[in-house]
Amino acid sequence: MAIAEGDRFKDKLTGQSFIVKKIMDRTIILEAEDTPNRFCLSDGIVELFFDRTENKKSVN
């Protein structure tokens, strides 16, 4: 699975939503949408503990 900046993921355990803020080499920085939580993880860990969710589309 290719992960890009702006992708959204949901934590499998808590259901909390995260957005991919930055990708540096193989490190992915996830930031929570509603709280100041931030994680720095590898792509394999993201796939293991998070489910991909739909990206919100802008409404014009």
PLM feature spans:
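Basic/aromatic-rich interaction segments and small domains that mediate binding to polyanionic partners
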Residues: 10-41
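Intrinsically disordered, low-complexity, charged/polar segments
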Residues: 34-60
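Short coil-to-beta transition motif at edge beta-strands of beta-rich domains
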Residues: 1-11
